[in-house]
């Protein structure tokens, strides 16, 4: 059964949670550019999380599984770092974007809420921290940031690649861990990273596609000075600048151990994403 709820309005939340034992909170606005007013992202992220937890507590929900992000774990976000369940992003560091602030502040609010709640019928919290999400789409909607970028890549509309690397997350891995997190007793009160352990460059991913016959894919890498120049004309490129040259290794050992998780292979994620887009575009 579907119902429509607003992250900034109380109406309908309690009714939606009636007779439920668990809540998955996966909604939070994302844009690849820096908005003029950072509260466009921060307010719905934090207030939406507050609303979910408040009504979950009132409805005697047993556990909330919250989708956060690895961007809430990046320290000062200006140098290489090893991230784990104990690392947090410093939102006061230089060049921290509104999106990064929104995810970090929303997750911190959630942990504070659970820590300070009335201990009668305590609400349990599990947090999942994915990276950039790829993998096959079940809706056929290519408007999201990851799928839109991927579509441009395989159709030849991305002539040059950013000189950066990412820890990719497969949407199927994320879905699996969310479902397992609902009832796994060992998961309560913990954060779980769901990404590749090591970063992979855009060139590496493009080469996988090229080798599979995607002839329009470019493997040329844009120099950083060129991207900085182009950022004057593109909000999307401007949003990428803080992450150029920034890499991290992710400790996913706790996720593997707790959920008996076998991550989907990078090559499979890359190719299955492309096949999914092929279907939508009828390529």
Regions found by a protein language model. Give the residues of each.
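Glycine-rich Rossmann NAD(P)(H)-binding loop
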Residues: 135, 161-164, 192-199, 210-211, ...
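Active-site Tyr-X1-5-Lys
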Residues: 93-125
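Active-site "gating" loop of Rossmann-like NAD(P)-dependent oxidoreductase/epimerase domains
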Residues: 29, 69-96, 138, 155
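Glycine/proline-rich active-site loop of Rossmann-fold NAD(P)-dependent oxidoreductases
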Residues: 119-121, 135-148, 181-192
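NAD(P)H-binding glycine-rich loop region in Rossmannoid oxidoreductase-like domains
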Residues: 1-47
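Conserved C-terminal active-site "lid" loop/helix of NAD(P)H-dependent oxidoreductases
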Residues: 229-262
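Mid/C-terminal beta-alpha module of Rossmann-like enzyme folds, strongest
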Residues: 177-238, 266-283
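A conserved pocket-lining segment of Rossmann-fold NAD(P)-dependent short-chain dehydrogenase/reductase
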Residues: 34, 90-95, 133, 139-140, ...
